[in-house]
C-alpha cells in the first residue's frame, strides 16, 4: 500500500493533526515531519498529534536511528504525541531516542491519551524524560 499522510490544523484544540497510512520509506517519514515543521510555523502551533497506527516501516532499526538523527532539528521545538501500534519494537526505539535527546515526543497507544498529554503539558517547556511514557 502506498504511503499517504494528511495534515490539518485543529484550531479548537490548538493542535496540528497528522494521519498516515501505508508502507513508509525513510523519505516518507522525513517528508511527513518536514511538513509538520512547516505547518507549525504557519499556524504558530508547537503541538502535534501524529497518528501512525496504519503505517508500516519498510526499514530496519539502524535506518530508524539514521532517520531520527536527520529529523532531530525539526523535532526539537515541537511537542509531538505519536499514536502507534504497540507491536512494533521500532516504535519503542523511537521513544527511547526521544527520551535520550530530551525531545518532547511521546508514544501513545490511543488518541485520547495522546490529546490529553498535549492539552495538559505546558507549551514551550521541556518535560522530564519518562514523564509520559508508553504503558507496558
Regions found by a protein language model. Give the residues of each.
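Amphipathic, Lys/Arg-enriched alpha-helical "gate/interface" segment within cytosolic domains
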Residues: 1-136
